[in-house]
């Protein structure tokens, strides 16, 4: 059951609803009004990056041979099974930053306050319950979609990754 969060940069208006939904989903209370008072404050695992003519929500791309997993000295980053997203065991994380440096997309972050990293887990528990990731559910324009890999032709997957890479390096869109 390998899924992927797909971004249509033409539909993203940088409203950041995905960021808010993500932070709330990863809060203790799961409620916006309570989450803003939690300590530590919940953090979004998706970040909307704005270019000159486009915006793109960025989150973990769930690399097949994830360098973050390979470099983690404590095995805090792992896959529950071969088809699961890259997950984080915060109890094992020592905040060494190796995964942050290794991530080719720059989407693993260090929580300075707690001295542990945080990253997108594709709302693994929500997806297991048959729900969409919080960012996808919250997107008012449909710029974010969650698709199973078998639903996406290989050519489209490759074209999508090239498109995102071009956006990140200043080319394209």
Placement of each model-derived feature along the sequence:
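N-terminal beta-strand motif that seeds the catalytic metal site of vicinal oxygen chelate
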Residues: 1-10
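Ordered, amphipathic secondary-structure segments that act as subunit-interaction surfaces
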Residues: 62-80, 84-85
């Amino acid at each position: 059951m390998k899924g992927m969060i797909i971004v249509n940069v033409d539909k993203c208006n940088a409203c950041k609803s995905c960021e808010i939904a993500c932070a709330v989903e990863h809060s203790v209370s799961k409620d916006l009004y309570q989450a803003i008072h939690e300590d530590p404050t919940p953090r979004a695992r998706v970040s909307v990056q704005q270019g000159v003519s486009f915006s793109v929500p960025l989150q973990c791309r769930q690399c097949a041979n994830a360098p973050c997993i390979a470099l983690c000295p404590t095995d805090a980053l792992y896959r529950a099974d071969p088809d699961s997203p890259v997950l984080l065991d915060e109890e094992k994380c020592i905040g060494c930053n190796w995964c942050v440096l290794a991530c080719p997309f720059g989407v693993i972050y260090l929580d300075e306050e707690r001295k542990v990293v945080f990253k997108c887990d594709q709302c693994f528990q929500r997806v297991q319950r048959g729900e969409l990731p919080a960012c996808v559910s919250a997107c008012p324009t449909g710029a974010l979609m969650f698709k199973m890999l078998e639903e996406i032709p290989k050519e489209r997957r490759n074209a999508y990754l090239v498109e995102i890479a071009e956006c990140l390096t200043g080319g394209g869109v």
